[in-house]
From Swiss-Prot:
Protein name: Serine hydroxymethyltransferase 1
Role noted for this protein: Catalyzes the reversible interconversion of serine and glycine with tetrahydrofolate (THF) serving as the one-carbon carrier. This reaction serves as the major source of one-carbon groups required for the biosynthesis of purines, thymidylate, methionine, and other important biomolecules. Also exhibits THF-independent aldolase activity toward beta-hydroxyamino acids, producing glycine and aldehydes, via a retro-aldol mechanism.
GO cellular component, one term: cytosol
GO annotation terms (biological process): glycine biosynthetic process from serine; tetrahydrofolate interconversion
Name of the coding gene: glyA1
Native organism taxonomy: Bacteria, Pseudomonadati, Pseudomonadota, Betaproteobacteria, Burkholderiales
Record key words, sorted: Amino-acid biosynthesis, Cytoplasm, One-carbon metabolism, Pyridoxal phosphate, Transferase
Site (Plays an important role in substrate specificity): H240
Entry similarity comment: Belongs to the SHMT family.
Length: 430
């Protein structure tokens, strides 16, 4: 009879059941995903494996607490313990990135960017960001995104030969169009942006300079990648990806007036109650990034990405910009006559997860694309090094070579077992 009672009327013991018994369908999905992560090679550049401590914080009782407002200035009672977590996250972010101000409440990187726009722009203002096909992000002015609908969005690109940001084009466009805000950063750009020149261009044209370091925040935290924080008026980031925390966003600045405007934009302007369980997990991840070992991790991420890209290039694949300075690489599949979506499917069937990705000058639709993006952060977290990433490169080459040759290439059928064996040697902690 108890299974017919509404949840509120069910015996207290029923609500204490572990997921496996309380909801077998969802438990099976969660366990299947755990098994997939355990036994496959994860090369999606925006993904990583968090620690057990981050999982514990995110799955804690802090999910029960509403806490609109900021520490010490809440609109609900009973917030003294969640205030501890949020204050810790703020202070750790400030220490890690050397800034005066941090807002840790954005639910995502996209909402962090939206909060900056809400704080600093008016509808119809001009913004200037990296073109999506050149490695930019949807929230930097893509027409399908709010940023491309509410603002007059302009874009800059990359040099057609080097595939590096054409800073002269950025300057010409900024001087001609006078944008209110210039954005540096992206989701598939593998080189170090010239943050100092971006700021100089912004200053010369009366623009605000925003750096979106969502992809390389962990590398910045580990001292392996130049920091945009000293140059940007505002820096946004996610807390996952290379920072290896829970999925979420964060906003950093040294400007007190901008900080006040951002606080008001995040709450009450854009969001209501913060996700306190996620903020607690952010604090844990930021604390982990402050440990000496994280610097070695950040350096290893870049070394491994370079090893992977070099092996793919040796095997005949075209790497956009000729290599990488960070955790990701973009592979142009056009010389091999392959589509990104087909490559993504074939690799997933072999136990290797990537994502299809546009390449500079791509004529294919976003659902197809002419490239794939690969990343090293997740498998580096498992303990893999350059030798393993060269092996991964060999597996990718075998799959894509077989796809190019109509499935006839020798060795392709052996890839799933080899990928599973490599994963088995570097298990996850959960």
């Amino acid at each position: 009879m108890n299974d017919l009672l509404p949840a509120a009327a069910a015996p207290a013991g029923a609500r204490a059941l572990p997921l496996r018994h309380a909801d077998p369908e969802i438990w099976r999905a969660v366990d299947a995903e755990r098994q997939r992560q355990m036994h496959s090679i994860e090369l999606i550049a925006s993904e990583n494996f968090v620690s057990q401590a981050v999982l514990d914080a995110q799955g804690s009782v802090m999910t029960n607490k509403y806490a609109e407002g900021y520490p010490g200035r809440r609109y609900y009672g009973g917030c003294r313990h969640v205030d501890v977590a949020e204050r810790a996250a703020i202070e750790r972010a400030r220490r890690l990135f050397g800034c005066e101000y941090a807002n840790v409440q954005p639910h995502s990187g996209s909402q962090a960017n939206q909060a900056v726009y809400l704080a600093l722009l008016a509808p119809g203002d001009r913004i200037l960001g990296l073109d999506l096909k050149a490695g930019g992000h949807l929230t930097h002015g893509a027409r399908v995104n709010l940023s491309g609908k509410w603002f007059e969005a302009l874009s800059y690109g990359v040099d057609p030969v080097s595939h590096r940001i054409d800073m002269d084009e950025v300057e010409r466009t900024a001087r001609r169009e006078r944008p209110r805000l210039i954005i540096a950063g992206g989701s598939a750009y593998a080189r170090v942006p010239d943050f100092a020149r971006f700021r100089a261009i912004a200053d010369a044209t009366g623009a605000l300079f925003v750096a979106d370091m969502a992809h390389y925040a962990g590398l910045v935290a580990g001292g392996a990648f130049p920091s945009p924080v000293p140059f940007a008026h505002v820096t946004t980031t996610t807390t996952h990806k290379t920072l290896r925390g829970p999925r979420g966003g964060m906003i950093l600045t040294d400007d007190a007036d901008i900080a006040r405007r951002i606080d008001a934009a995040v709450f009450p302007g854009l969001q209501g109650g913060p996700l306190m369980h996620v903020i607690a997990a952010k604090a844990v991840a930021l604390g982990e990034a402050l440990q000496p070992g994280f610097r070695a991790y950040a350096r290893a991420v870049i070394d491994n990405a370079r090893a992977l890209c070099a092996r793919l290039a040796e095997g005949g694949l075209s790497i956009v910009s000729g290599g990488t300075d960070c955790h990701l690489g973009v592979v142009d599949l056009r010389p091999w006559g392959l589509a990104g979506n087909a490559a993504e499917r074939a690799l997933e069937e072999a136990g290797i997860t990537v994502n299809k990705n546009a390449v500079p000058g791509d004529a294919a639709s976003p659902a197809v694309t002419s490239g794939i993006r690969v990343g090293s952060a997740a498998c580096t977290s498992r303990g893999m090094g350059p030798a393993e990433f060269r092996q991964i490169g060999d597996l990718v080459l075998a799959v894509l070579g077989g796809l190019r040759d109509g499935g006839q290439a020798g060795g392709r059928d052996a890839v799933p077992a080899r990928a599973a064996e490599l994963s088995r040697r570097f298990p996850l902690p959960y």
